[in-house]
């Protein structure tokens, strides 16, 4: 799962937002970015930043939606009990994956350049992460779930065209397929990551 590291690092850098939500997806991302810069460049202990990140991420990212998508075809064949177990494990996995890399970015600068409504439920916000010392400019596209305009949620982001959700789906499905379709093999991988 190391292939997702850069995506998780970038995701953590921009998931700090206020409890209220902007109705406009571009405004939502701008709000997230502005506050992320303040929090990540502060002198707060890393532990404090992680607590804030996890609390806010649960409100600004559709973790459950991403988790069910990453199960792919298996979400239709597993029992409700296994589905519930997976959702809990994925949430813990997801939060630990990016919060543990919080310190990788201290003052991200990102500019929202455009947005495009692709359906009644989704809007894509296009942005650029400015180049910094040792880091090139990066194109980031945010997939915002806007079915409830009062509470838009991040459901995916594409870094230079690479989708976080799709990449995770491929990795999870590979684990299950390589273990004869046994969902418990994925549970084991997630549990090992969470406790290490």
Label every model-predicted segment:
Residues 70, 90, 114-116, 128-131, ...:
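A mature extracytoplasmic/lumenal domain signature
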Residues 96-138, 189, 193-196:
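Surface-exposed, charged secondary-structure patches
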Residues 17-22:
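Sec/Tat signal peptide C-region and signal peptidase I cleavage site
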Residues 137-166:
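Short beta-strand edge/turn micro-motifs at domain boundaries
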Residues 1-7:
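Bacterial N-terminal signal peptides that target proteins for export
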Residues 156-196:
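Low-complexity, intrinsically disordered terminal/linker segments enriched in charged
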Residues 7-15:
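Bacterial N-terminal signal peptides
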Residues 24-102:
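Early exported N-terminus immediately downstream of N-terminal targeting peptides
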């Amino acid at each position: 799962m190391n292939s997702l590291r850069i995506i998780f690092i970038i995701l953590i850098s921009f998931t700090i937002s206020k409890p209220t939500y902007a109705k406009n997806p571009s405004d939502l991302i701008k709000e997230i970015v502005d506050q992320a810069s303040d929090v990540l460049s502060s002198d707060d202990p890393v532990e404090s930043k992680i607590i804030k990140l996890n609390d806010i991420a649960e409100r600004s990212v559709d973790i459950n939606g991403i988790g069910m998508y990453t199960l792919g075809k298996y979400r239709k064949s597993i029992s409700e009990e296994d589905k519930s177990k997976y959702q809990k494990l994925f949430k813990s996995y997801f939060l630990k994956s990016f919060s543990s890399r919080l310190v990788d970015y201290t003052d991200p600068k990102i500019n929202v350049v455009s947005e495009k409504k692709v359906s009644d439920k989704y809007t894509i916000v296009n942005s650029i992460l400015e180049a910094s010392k040792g880091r090139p400019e990066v194109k980031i596209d945010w997939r915002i779930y806007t079915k409830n305009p009062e509470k838009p949620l991040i459901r995916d982001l594409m870094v230079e065209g690479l989708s976080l959700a799709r990449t995770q789906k491929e990795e999870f499905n590979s684990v299950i397929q390589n273990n004869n379709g046994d969902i418990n093999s994925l549970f084991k991988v997630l549990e090992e990551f969470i406790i290490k």
